[in-house]
Amino acid sequence: MNDALIKKVAFVTGGGSGIGEASSKALARAGAVVAIADTNLLEAERVVDEILAEGGIAKSYKLDVSADAAVESVIAAIEKDFGGLHIAVNNAGIGGDLAPTGDQTPEGWRKVMAVNLDGVFYCMRHEITAMKKVGGGSIINMASILGAVGFAGSAGYVAAKHGVIGLTQTSAIEYATDGIRVNAVGPGFINTPLLAALPQEAMAGIEALHPMNRLGKPEEVGALVLFLASPDASFITGGYYPVDGGYLAR
């Protein structure tokens, strides 16, 4: 990657923890200017402070991606603050209700769709507009291994992540000639604060779902995000790339 990302402007949603935090730090270490958005502004500010302490450049923004007007406002602010947008990591997401499809509520379904699918769409529509102004860019959408298979009890989450992959593939075709690459990453079960709160027995069961018999690390996903953001991935668009310890190969 060399110095190719130095001073490139990257926008990361859900950047205050987990995969978003790891992706933000990976991009910053490669020289990118990172705009970190999160519903939890304190966590976003913590990540910014840690990046600044390492000599990087970053700024925090409070954002709920389920509100299109809020997304538009934050991206406009990033353009004003840093002069453009070159990289976007649409990572913000929630888990949703755990229940069989027939027991899911319309309210729960709508909530997970609003963040996990609508939020990606809202971000993309404004990111694409911004990237056209600078001659192109790279959009990385955080899907999931559950964007490729089913998982009992998670109908809303699974449907949303399948939708993210379809949106990624369609947009990659539509904007290839504009120099905008669009790819999706499919993390397996990653050792984030959400999973770390589970009992040890439950953690062991989740680890066993992966042939590598462990959880992934946020930094392992961040490394792929960094590659897809870079010119090293210049002929890669419309793809879906699992980071799953062999989960989908079972």
Model-identified regions with their sequence ranges:
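Alpha-helical segment proximal to the catalytic Tyr-Lys
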Residues: 129, 173-177, 234
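Active-site helix of classical SDR
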Residues: 124, 160, 168
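Canonical Rossmann dinucleotide-binding motif of NAD(H)/NADP(H)-dependent dehydrogenases/reductases
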Residues: 3-35
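Short C-terminal tail/terminal secondary-structure segment
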Residues: 4, 95-98, 149, 209, ...
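Substrate-binding pocket helix/loop in short-chain dehydrogenase/reductase
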Residues: 99-101, 105-110, 195, 206
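Residue(s) in the substrate-gating loop at a strand-loop-helix junction
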Residues: 144
